[in-house]
Each structure stands twice: as structure tokens, then as C-alpha cells.
Amino acid sequence: MKYTKCNFMMSVLGIIIYVTDLVADIVLSVRYFHDGQYVLGVLTLSFVLCGTLIVHCFSYSWLKADLEKAGQENERYFLLLHCLQGGVFTRYWFALRTGYHVVFKHSDRKSNFMEEQTDPHKEAIDMATDLSMLRLFETYLEGCPQLILQLYAFLECGQANLSQCMVIMVSCCAISWSTVDYQIALRKSLPDKNLLRGLWPKLMYLFYKLLTLLSWMLSVVLLLFVDVRVALLLLLFLWITGFIWAFINHTQFCNSVSMEFLYRIVVGFILVFTFFNIKGQNTKCPMSCYYTVRVLGTLGILTVFWIYPLSIFNSDYFIPISATIVLALLLGIIFLGVYYGNFHPNRNVEPQLDETDGKAPQRDCRIRYFLMD
């Protein structure tokens, strides 16, 4: 494994998107409060706080486990940083500093911030991988709900202010970036996995995820116009289903029972929006079932909206949005098939043992038990 300049630049771009997303959300929430739209302001701020709190819980949990593994006991300092919501920024500082020394200074430094002897390339890759997992959490816990909320607010009033447009654009960029960056980090940190080489595999994967996600979020927005309670009940049902699926698969990502429970809650929430392999096993059947349900759900929502009185919604937007939903879903499924049929790194690899059963030569790394593609 080798940490490259490309990996370093991806980390730099990652923190730029992270900070921009955070600032845009705060500015928009202030704008809502200033305009007297208190419900939208509270919801916008709540999504930000909820996402960052959960992300920092996982960040501190991982750091605590790493410190205990290294025999260190200086965790109170890091606990304070995470309580002040500075854990992610601290991780970025160490990751960028380490990455800079590795790729530009060609440092042979062998100790990290835990005073542990380690290979600098491995250290830089592990730090970047932890950040990619945290960004993935933040994207689906905060970015996706935020995007649905802002699209709903935009369609309800028929126009968007600059802050709203900024949040929508940054959320789309954050979702796109974190999705691709996570796949690159996943395969970079696990030597037994084939790398995602070239531009086309990354583009196919990005379009598959982004288009299916866009189609579903627009469908949810339409359902919110029909009946907010029905939309929330549907999302709750899907979350519970994903939560139960995580329990059935006996995920083993966290060391503590409480954090594993929280992890399964988050996995259930992520599965509301997109599919991930939560146990590293063959996913052909689960993925087929998932997107079959997604297609049926999307068509059902469009059917309900067509027969519902259009007085609740600006009809000028309905036909373009309906066409966008159908086209995005169709193209997303096509890109899914193209990616797994022609560009997936494991498409020509002989079937092997389950990646999480520990019977094959593997490097001990927490991402091995995280969400796969």
C-alpha cells in the first residue's frame, strides 16, 4: 500500500466540501429564522446537529479503541475535543499533516499522534479511511434529509434563495464525493480487494448511486406533498426494515454493544436511501430485491400523486419532476447493471470465502466490517 498525492488531494477536497456544507447549512438556518420560517430553520439545524453528534460518537469510539489497543490512556483530551464537536477537524488535521509528510517530505517518521510505532503510508491510509467512513455517515444522516427538506421547501414556495441553492448544490457534491471517495478508500485499505482503477468504473458507480438516490428523494418529496404523515410512516417502515436486516446479518462493526446498536440504527437509516452490502457477502439477491422494491415504491408514489388533486402542488413542476424521477431511476438501474457487469473490480475473480469470516489472509482494519459495495 502506498499513500499518493492523489489520495492527499482527495483529503484536501474532502475537508473543503465538509466545511462548505457545514457553513451553508448554518447560513440557511439563520436565513430561515430571520424570515420567520422557524419550522424550516429548526429542521435544517436539527439535521446538522443530529448528523454531527452521531459522527462524533463513532469518531471517539474508534479513537478510544485505537488508544486502548496501543496501550495509551490520554483519551480525556480527545473526549473533550469530540464533545466540542472538533473531533472530525482534529482527524483532518492529523490526516493532512501525516499525508503531507508522506507524499511531499518523503518522511520516514514512524510514530503517530498516539505515540505508536507505525508505517507512515499505512498510517496515512488508515486516517483517510476513517475519515471516508465518517463522511459517509454524515452524508446519509445529514445530507440526504437536508436535500429532501430543501427540495420540498423550494417546490412549496416556487422559488429558491441563494442560500437554499447553495445548500442543494453542496449537498449534491457532498453525496457524490463521499460515495466515490469511500469506494476508493475501501479498496485502498484492504489489500485483498482489487482497486477501483481508471475513470470509467468510478463514473459508473457514481452515476448509479446518484441517479437512484435522486429518483428516490424526489419521490419522497412528492409524497410529502400528498401527506406528510404517510411519507414519514413510509420512511419509518423502511428504516425499521433496514434495522432488522442489520440485526439478522449480525453486523460486527463496533467493539461495544451500545455502539453496535447505534451502528445498526444508522445502517437502517442509510438503507432507506441506498443499498450497501452490510456484511461483505454476495449481494446479488438482496440487491435485486432492494431495487425491485424501490421501483415498485417509486411507481406507487407516482401513481398516487397522479390521482391526487393537483391543487396541492404547482402543476408546472409536476410533469418535469415525474419525468426526472422515471428517467433517473431507469438510468440508475442501467448504470448499476453496467458497473457490476463490466467495471466491478471483482467481476472476473473466482468466488472466495466470505470476506468477514477471517479464513483468508487479511489485514486487520475496521473498514473490513463496514458497509461494502
Swiss-Prot record:
Key word Transmembrane present: yes
Classification via InterPro entries: XK-rel (IPR018629), XK-related_scramblase (IPR050895)
GO cellular component, one term: plasma membrane
Activity control mechanisms: Activated upon caspase cleavage to generate the XK-related protein 9, processed form. Does not act prior the onset of apoptosis.
Record site: Cleavage: 357-358
Compartments in which it is found: Cell membrane
Tissue: Highly expressed in the small intestines; weakly expressed in the pancreas, liver, stomach, and large intestines.
BP term (GO), one: apoptotic process
Any Pfam family hit: XK-related
Keywords from the named record: Apoptosis, Cell membrane, Membrane, Transmembrane, Transmembrane helix
Membrane topology: Multi-pass membrane protein
Keyword Transmembrane in record: yes
Cysteines joined through disulfide linkages: none
Protein's UniProt name: XK-related protein 9
Organism: Mus musculus
